[in-house]
Amino acid sequence: MTRVLGIEGTAWCASAAVFDAETDAVFIDSDAYVPESGGIHPREAAEHMREAVPSVVEAALDHVESNWGDPADAIDAVAFSRGPGLGPCLRIAGTAARSLAGTLSCPLVGVNHMVAHLEIGRHRSGFESPVCLNASGANAHVLGYHNGRYRVLGETMDTGVGNAIDKFTRHVGWSHPGGPKVESHAEDGDYVELPYVVKGMDFSFSGIMSAAKQAYDDGTPVADVCCGLQETIFAMLAEVSERALSLTGADELVVGGGVAQNSRLQEMLTQMCENRGAAIYVPEPRFLRDNAGMIAVLGAKMYEAGDIISIPESGVRPDFRPDEVPVSWRDDEAVARPVPTDERRQGAEAVVDIDADGGRVTKRRLEKAYRHPVLDSRLRSQRTRSEARLTSEARRQGVPTPVVYDVDPDAGRLVFQYVGDADLKTALSESAVRDVGRHLAACHAAGFVHGDPTPRNVRVGEDRAFLIDFGLGYYTDAVEDYAMDLHVFEGALGGTADDPTAQITAFEDAYRSAGDGAVVDHLREIETRGRYQ
């Protein structure tokens, strides 16, 4: 059976581990860098890595020798984190891995750190094809497997979730890491309103941090700000995870990353999954924070698939995105599943009852138990009003949308005309995609965005495509906001379609022909903002 020694050194934690596939046992030895003040300084982190990596590797080798004898005979491969991360730290860990592989005369495996966060949860849960939420210091994204790669279904458009929280705690004067301190203070606080920024399945944290700092400076008790911070950020992560489950039809969620150690976040995600009838797996804390155990486990899967790397090709990649990794170790089904066609459907936000014979659809935005009641009530009412208003506005602009028959914002209830025969996810065609491009161009020309134009929010009829669910839409004259509409649609296509390239080209061509080409040009700039672009 396979036995792999893994080395982790992406940023702050020097770690070495041994994974024995026969027993599924994982030995981990770690030495984390703790700055004297402020956040992580790359030079100091690299100095720590230089001192700590040899000692954790030695501990791993001692473990091998005491259990299986000579490491040269007992170890099948050495795996290391190639990225993403801090370049100086990655290079130290990479050098150690190359040297050790040479000493042991065994193959070298280069692992993507973020995919390892996903795979350790999938490995230990036994899930077939889950959606994964990674919530760590420098990252926040939702992934799903499709056609040989993990696709980014949603991600932060600015800073990582942990780094965002740390920026607030440094402003307050607390030492690193800030997350546990926010969690502790939030227990004694009352909710305060902060910006809630979800765009399709992407999110942004910079505005929340600025508002939290301002609230603290204005005299709001720090415990209250911490409570508002947790309730807002973690509700965003839970909502986007639910949107990904709804988009793909998946019923499994795995969670990774150090921020996921937060008990309130785990509670929110568990409540969300229970309400959907989905299974959730949160690894034990030693596998959530940065660790070499996940590197060794994924390294073993890659080694068994023949996915090894030569020394000349083993350079580190500080900007190594998870969707760049060819997934050589699995060939099972994609995360995208068939969409139910029964008369009652559960989306990310609402339950929809369909009366096809009567030509009506009743949509109810249900209370979300995972969200703070004040936040939940505000979002449900706002989104119901926006959906009714913008659905009708789009129709006035010549965009095919359902007629709104009734609306009750306080109850989160709308009654619509039943339109289309299927949603775009199951009836994908170039002509329908072109319709979406033209429809969004018309909305933008009238000064508003859809907000969540995924394939699930497009209904396809015999001769046209209809836009539905404008709940995240709003009035705006910003090219940035128009381009985000395009980004959301293309990201959802990329995560669920077998070959999205032709559809994306048709979509952009149609948008350019009917709208402002500057929006498509701005889309290219937005695409550089995702983590490690």
Swiss-Prot record:
Lineage start: Archaea, Methanobacteriati, Methanobacteriota, Stenosarchaea group, Halobacteria
Superkingdom: Archaea
Obligatory cofactor(s): Fe(2+)
Catalyzed reaction equations: L-seryl-[protein] + ATP = O-phospho-L-seryl-[protein] + ADP + H(+); L-threonyl-[protein] + ATP = O-phospho-L-threonyl-[protein] + ADP + H(+); L-threonylcarbamoyladenylate + adenosine(37) in tRNA = N(6)-L-threonylcarbamoyladenosine(37) in tRNA + AMP + H(+)
UniProt cross-references to NCBIfam families, sorted A to Z: arch_bud32, arch_KAE1, gcp_kae1, PRK09605.1
Annotated TM spans: none
Keyword Transit peptide: no
Binding-site residues for Fe cation, renumbered to this chain: 113, 117, 290
Biological source species: Natronomonas pharaonis (strain ATCC 35678 / DSM 2160 / CIP 103997 / JCM 8858 / NBRC 14720 / NCIMB 2260 / Gabara) (Halobacterium pharaonis)
Subcellular location, record wording: Cytoplasm
Function: Required for the formation of a threonylcarbamoyl group on adenosine at position 37 (t(6)A37) in tRNAs that read codons beginning with adenine. Is a component of the KEOPS complex that is probably involved in the transfer of the threonylcarbamoyl moiety of threonylcarbamoyl-AMP (TC-AMP) to the N6 group of A37. The Kae1 domain likely plays a direct catalytic role in this reaction. The Bud32 domain probably displays kinase activity that regulates Kae1 function.
Protein name as it appears in the record: Probable bifunctional tRNA threonylcarbamoyladenosine biosynthesis protein
